[in-house]
Structures are given as C-alpha cells and as structure tokens.
Amino acid sequence: MAFHFPLMPRMFMAVRREDRHPIVEILRQTPDIPDTCQWGIFLRNHDELTLEMVTDEERDYMYQAYATDPQMRINGGIRRRLAPLMENSRRRIELMNSLLFSLPGTPVVYYGDEIGMGDNIYLGDRNGVRTPMQWTGDRNAGFSRADAAALYAPLISDPVYGFTAVNVEAQERAPFSLVNWM
C-alpha cells in the first residue's frame, strides 16, 4: 500500500472551488504502481491535512479556505478534523467521504471522522486532533476508566463536537446518523 499524499489536498480544493480539475489533474499525474500494490487514499493523514505536495499558491489557498486561524496550522499543513474542516456540514462531510470511497485506491478513514468528531486547536502540537475516541456520552467518553486528568489528551467537551453530543453509542441508535451512513 502506498499513500497517495498529493490527492488529499486536491479533494479539498475541488470541493471548495466546486471544480473537478484539481482531482483530475493529480490523477493524470499519478504514476502507475505494480499490480500487486494499491494506493491508500485518505482525507487526512493521521493528524493533519498535509500541504507539503502543493504549490505555494495552493497552500495559501488552502490556508485561506480551511485554516484562517494560525492555531489550525502545523508543519506546512492543517491540523483539523474533517467535521470542523467542513464547518460541520453533513452534506459536505458526505460529499468528501463519497469522493474518498469512489476514487481509485483503498480508502483510509481516520478515527472519529466516521462520527463527525471535532478537535481542539488550542492543544499543543498535533494533540488537538489526537483526543480520545468518543465511544459514549458517559465518563471519559467511554474511552478509559482512568481519571480524566490521566488521559493523554483532554476530551472534546464543547456543545457542538463534545462527547455528550457526538459519540458512537448515540449514533449507532440513530438510523440516519453519520456512522450509519458510512
């Protein structure tokens, strides 16, 4: 499996611009790989939307479109989860995932994106998108029985993306939830 890093930012550019060309152009430039291999495609690489393989102009565009606050940027990329990148628009989140699942390659979904988890841009380094998985609306989001202070990163607790509002357990019970759509 080879990660297709150049495709990721172009999917975001294409959706924001409402223009297929960023995707079409990068797919045309994509080299062939051996028949026994596959491209791994993704909307974010682990904990950032990397912009290392775009032009300076494209990077500036992506920052203006998706990371206006400098706290959202890291290492030449954007440290946000999918739902906040899409302004929590269910239709845009579905569109991005539809692209992911329809393009050539093996789709890779970063934990939490299947339920629309948020982030905390004020945590240092990449920790803003490395918060505990929100399994339930219970203590520590069902992630751990440890004291909350002992968790690697604090839970997301805001009213929009917090673990009491966004979690696997609640979405599994809702037939039209994002996790059931996925």
PLM regions and their residue ranges:
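Active-site and adjacent substrate-binding regions of carbohydrate-active enzymes
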Residues: 1-182
